[in-house]
Amino acid sequence: MTTSSSQVHSLAVPNRRLPRISLGMLLVLPALTAILLLYALPLARSLVTAFRDSSGAWTTDHVVRAFSLYGRDMLFSVGVVSVSLALIAAISIAISGYLVLGATPWAVRLLRWLYRWPLFIPFVVTGQIARSFLATNGMMNNVLVETGLMASSSAQSFLDWRGLVLTFAWKQVPFVTLLLAGAMAAVDRSHIEAARNAGANRLRCLFEIVLPQAAPSLWVGLILSLVAMLSVLSVPMMLISGNPTMMTAMMAHRITYYGDYGIANALGLFSYALTAVTAWVYLRLTLRREATA
Amino acid sequence: MSTEALTLNNVTVDLRQQRILDGIHLDVSPGSFTCLLGPSGCGKTTLLRAIAGFTPLSQGDIRLGARSITHLPPEKRHTAMVFQSYALWPHMSVGDNLGYPLKLRGVPRAERKRRIAAMLERLELGGFESRAVTQLSGGQRQRIALGRALIIDPPLLLLDEPLSNLDAAIRRSLRSELRRLQKSLGITTIMVTHDQEEALQMADQIVLMRAGKVIQVAAPQTLYQQPADLGVARFLGVDNTVTRHEQDPTVGSRAATFGFRTRDARINEPLRPATLTRKGRVTECVYTGDGYQISLDTNEAELFATANSPIALGTFAVLQVPESALIPFGPDDRHLPPLDRHEDIA
Ligand SMILES: Nc1ncnc2c1ncn2[C@@H]1O[C@H](COP(=O)(O)OP(=O)(O)OP(=O)(O)O)[C@@H](O)[C@H]1O
Ligand SMILES: [Mg+2]
């Protein structure tokens, strides 16, 4: 009854489908416009600017100069980001693993409560804290000297690549842990118990049973961290004074002192490429996993 | 590793200040098949988990063979547990699932491969090595989970309702398959079930639990014919209880109550000597496949009996139970030992 009447209806008024499409369009439009205007357009513009000279002619000049001027900074960025990601992954796995497999209930509860705090501190403040903590006469060295663990003469500044790595890790570990611990908690408890029953200790359980099942969340967390580290300006500006430094600092330098958008965009191009490659690798991995599952 | 005896001594478990298991004593002889039977929530799973090492004891001792395993972590106990949900690892193939316990024991790859293939043959799943476990049927998963437990030749096999997720037909066939496998390997096995039929069919010894305590440990026949008390009897299908009358058979003259099963009570048959009889009004008549189940309203209780043909509702009928089918209970609802019968007859 109902189907036939609705068929008749749609046959009689074929153009009734039209308003529905436009209603859908209407709903999508704000989001679409925002993405186009605020994201796609600037992205395209910056890509184009990277390949145009001041007269508007096409050129690869900016890219070549960006590489020759800032090649070291690019390598430095890649290095710092890679070491940071490795550190972030290691610490996040350790914390989430303990949250899921830990045998001391009060320690697990305390850790669960503690690890999230850095999440609520912005990058600028993090940079400031790290600065006063890691400097030559900063808190870390003071404590080490006071407690007699280190001679005051051997105190050195950590405000270089090490400071960057530590700061990035401090800021990003809680975020990645949040994702990873959630995914690990979702792993069926009996999978862990079955493994332990089969003879696996906690560590093997973590790396052979829990982590493989939670890995997609780890990858997502690391890729988002990569993007965050490549885009943050405050931390490298505050922690590193000389050369080489992160590309964001160099881009800002290029724009504020020279008004040179061409080279700044060429540097940006490199950041895009780096994240794009990582995202592509991740997609390949997940697609292959889904194909075999 | 050869099969071993299991001994539980005063095993007590508290979870969140609540006593879940209360002073459990149990001896399981090597190579035997023991069923833990009892109503939902009585602590069967908890007991199994305590043996496997997942639930800490607040008192007591668990021994496997000569050694105490009470304080060992689960991975050092070498028990093999099959989980109710099977708990196959979804990121590993069938072969990897079976091979993981061997890998943990450092068995070389070639040897692993050979033993996985042999186990799959044994489970009648030959050639399934590279299948994803997510693509298996319920019965196949169950068998892989069993294979994963057996592949290390464990001294003790623990099964938590391994058949309860399966449909009736697979269940029956797996029941005998499991029993055959257990016998051929001679492995000490403890299985949790709340299905009395399953326990009676499979077990050498049944442990009947209630509210965290062991009520009775007996062979299936003994448990079926001489349940420790009325509660156990009801759990084992003794649906009818009557208070003893003067004219009732002399068996267990000290009995206050008799219990009997519905299928032992007949309706409107020629009266025989040495039987218990009760008269009542028929209130219900249900076809059960083997015959008709009749509900009888007597003065003291509602009783159930079996008839070959339907009986009109509202009519009066006589229920008759042979003396041999009567289970005598004392005033405290405890079963009267068979010794009493002899004394009574003498
Ligand atoms: N982690 C826990 N914390 C607190 N109480 C628990 C916990 N696990 C189980 N219990 C309680 O212990 C009692 C026994 O549970 P258990 O799972 O052993 O029962 P069971 O005999 O296996 O029941 P079923 O036949 O329904 O599986 C239940 O009352 C349950 O509520
Ligand atoms: Mg249970």
Annotate each PLM feature.
Chain A
Residues 52-56, 233-261:
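Glycine-rich helix-loop "coupling/hinge" segments at transmembrane-helix boundaries
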Residues 115, 192-193:
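Short alpha-helical segment that forms part of, or immediately flanks, the ligand-binding pocket
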Residues 285-293:
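Short cytosolic juxtamembrane segments of multi-pass membrane proteins
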Residues 58-67:
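A short amphipathic helical element positioned immediately N-terminal to and/or at the very start
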Residues 187-191, 290-291:
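Short glycine/proline-centered loop/turn elements that form peptide/ligand docking sites
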Residues 1-20:
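Short, Lys/Arg-rich, polar N-terminal cytosolic tail immediately upstream
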Residues 198-200, 212:
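Glycine/proline-centered hinge or cleavage motifs at structural transition points of membrane proteins
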Residues 20-52, 69-153, 159-185, 213, ...:
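Membrane-water interface segments at the C-terminal ends of transmembrane alpha-helices
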